[in-house]
Amino acid sequence: MSNIKEVLINKKNCKSVWFMRQAGRYLPEFREIRSQNQDFINLCLNSELSSKITLQPIKRFNLDSAIIFSDILMVPYALNQKVDFLKNLGPKLENFNLNKFLKNNEIDFVEKLKPVYKAIEITRKRLNKEKSLISFVGAPWTLLVYMIGAKSSKKEIDLKLINRKKDEISLVLEKLINYLCLHIDNQIRAGADVVQVFDSWAGLLPQEDLNSFCYTPNSKIVEFCKKKDIPVICFPRGIKENYKVFNNLVKPNGLNIDYN
């Protein structure tokens, strides 16, 4: 059993440290590859390069775990919503169309993400068996924020939009849970042995919406992972004093503590 998996399952007395962006933004070997691959989505779909980037920090620092090089927005991409990464601005998604979203199907979704699973397979074969391979997804709420353009600023959300579209949002969240579980299942089959769920924009939610839009969706994903006997780490960034409530309700194997 790999080190991090043993810590999460057997509750070893060990304080784990997560190196955010293990490769991205600072390793010169990564920056060289990135400079030659301007289209970020295509880079994530290049199985060989994705594996190579994943292993770069392991070769430098001999960390306990590798984190597959990918992005949470590969899911909207696979659901046929155009995703661009603009230099110095970050991700930009085309306007959300509910009817188009609802026409998606699982077969096409998996087909578009096959290069991601291939990258996991390649990496697992190259990675020391004592080291974990962590895959990840964005939580439903966080993906939805990007997909419907719900952010009005870096630290605020368009509450009028959220309140106006609550029925639509609930429908989209439920669909996203299903697609995310499918994505996780395929990552596990490919060789991932730990899953991380990033709820990067959980902190934007008002208190009254945390249960419906954060706790419940995360709980369903955690339950799915546990049925697969795969430990899961959650990161509901920005929920502050609600971390204890999240932990008690969602019951992940591990919890990233917010750094704000």
Residue ranges with predicted function:
Residues 72-75, 90-91, 140-142:
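A short acidic, glycine/proline-enriched capping/turn motif at secondary-structure boundaries
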Residues 39, 46, 95-100, 154-155:
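Intrinsic-disorder/low-complexity, polar/charged segments
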Residues 112-260:
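Active-site loop segments of alpha/beta catalytic cores
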Residues 30-32, 81-93, 146-158:
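Short, flexible, mixed-charge acidic loops at enzyme active sites
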Residues 1-81, 85, 220:
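N-terminal basic, low-complexity leaders that serve as flexible interaction/assembly modules and, when applicable
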Residues 17-26, 89-92, 153, 210-211, ...:
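Short low-complexity stretches enriched in small and charged residues
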Residues 36-39, 98-108, 162-170:
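Short glycine/proline- and acidic residue-enriched helix-loop micro-motifs
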Residues 88-126:
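A gly/proline- and charged-residue-enriched helix-loop-helix capping module
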